[in-house]
Each structure stands twice: as C-alpha cells, then as structure tokens.
Amino acid sequence: ESSYDLVIDNQSLSYGILEVQKNVPLIEIIHHPITKDLYYDLQFSKGIIQKISKWRWFSFLKMQKKVAIQLKVISTPSDNSKKDIAKDFGVAKKNISVIHNGIDYLSFTPLEDIQRVPNQIITTASADVPLKGLDFTLYAIARLKEDYPELRLVIIGEPRPEGHTERLIKKLQIEKNIFYRSSLTRDEIAVEYAKSNIAIVSSLYEGFGFPVGEAMSCAIPLIATNVASIPEITGPFAELIPAESSKAIESAIRNIFANPESYQVKADAGRIHIIENFNWQKIALSYEELIYKTIEEFEC
C-alpha cells in the first residue's frame, strides 16, 4: 500500500508511470508534446547525418506516445497544448485538463526608478535550439543596426560556445550589438526588462511561454509570434506577428520606436491582464480542484 495520497509526474512519460497509476492517484503534467521539438529540429537540420542524429535522440517519443494514451489524468498549461497532445499522442481530450502556469507578478514588476537604456531590446533564449526562433530576431537586428547603430539586444540565456547562434552573430557582424545575461534571479531579470524598451518572443512554438507572461508583467511593450499558446497568454496586449519572419520583427520594432507612448499604454494594460488571469492564487485553486477530483475518482 502506498504512503502517498497523490503522485504528480512532470512529463517523464515512462513505462514505470503506468505502474504508479495502478496503485496511486496520478496526475501527469505534459507541457507540450515533444513531437513539436522534433519537427522543428528536423526542419532546421542540415544534411542527412544531422537528421538521423535527431531521430535517434528523439527515439524516446515512441515510449511517450504509448504511455500518454493510457494515462487517465493529464494537466497541461494551454488549450493549444491540449489540442496538440490529443492530436500527436492520441490522448482523449476528456482526460486532459488545462491549468495555466502562474506568473510571479510581484517579482516581474515595473521598476519606475530604473531608466530605460536608449535603443535596448530584450529577448529570452533558454536553449540554443530552432524552436526558440532566435535567428529571426538576429537577422532583424542586423538590418536595424544600419539605422540604429547603438541598438542593443540583451539575450537572457547562456550562449553555447561555438554553437549555431554564436556563429550566426559573427556572420551577421552584430557582435557589438548583442549582450548575454545568464544565471540571473527573477528580480535581476526584472531589472533587465526595466532597462529595455521592447521585449521580443520570436518562438516557433510554445507550450506556454513564461517569457511572454513575464515581459507583460513587467509592463514592457511586447512583440511576440502569433503561434501555439502565445496568443492565449497575450490577449490583445502584444504586437503579434507571423513566425519565421525577421521582416515582421523589424517592422514591429520600428513601429514601437516611432510611437512608444501608445505601445506603453497597451503594455500597462497587459500587466493588469496578467495579474488578473495568471496569478498563482487562481492557478493554485485550479490545481486543488483537480487534485481532489483525481483522488476521489481513484477511490471509487
């Protein structure tokens, strides 16, 4: 007999989880189906050897699909992820609950005593992978620097030495315009947002997209791709653009630089939107409801 009232598993989707489900109430968290990561990795792979390597790396997907379809209770952070989990993993939609992630709006808050650095833009790249769409922002920066020589792009993340992004930055000759910040606390990230004039999320796919909510919580004008879960988070309070378009990023940046006051009004409203809809108190109540429901149905 288990000494646990409930097990919450974060997307291991391993065969052992099915054994756990037999003996204990189980909630499986699936952020998004990793089939999306494989799709974009293959799309941007160069040559057959690289594609084969990606297929081998993602071979665990066979197991995840077999496990996911047998799970009774799944929680995911967006309606878009629910749709994709049902489609790619074959899971019945009735087994999937949508509970958004919460945004720490007390840490990610406007800091009015900090002055914005002229022509500074900020983005987040948690990993050097195609899914994050950083390439398209870099191409936009390369064109914009002709008109804005002092343009600065702050990237929250750590570069992979001699990785794809570093090579592209050198190729575009924008080394002097790029500034990495890594190992920052939430409060330190909020300071970087406060220094910046525009936040960019150029992802090709997001299961939820913390950088979207965190930027909005800091009341900074946001440019974000109109894909996957992102419009669920932003509502009408961001400049939504097509994915995989450096020209759209460039155009949006120019528009905000030309008319910062009107975009700031939208950004201020965006913070209120985040506080009202993505606060942890509200999210916790949704989890509490799902937890009790899962335990009760297991015992029946």
List PLM regions with ranges.
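Short alpha-helical donor nucleotide-sugar binding micro-motif in glycosyltransferases
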Residues: S183-L184, V191-S196
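Conserved acidic donor-binding segment of nucleotide-sugar-dependent glycosyltransferases
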Residues: E239-S246, N255-E261
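Conserved donor-binding/catalytic core segment of Leloir-type glycosyltransferases
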Residues: I114-K132, L138-I141
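Membrane-proximal helix-turn-helix segments that form the acceptor-binding/catalytic region
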Residues: K51-I74
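Short hydrophobic beta-strand element within catalytic cores of glycosyltransferases
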Residues: P221-A224
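Carbohydrate-associated surface elements
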Residues: N80, G102
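Nucleotide-activated donor-binding/catalytic signature segment of Leloir-type glycosyltransferases, i.e.
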Residues: T165-D187
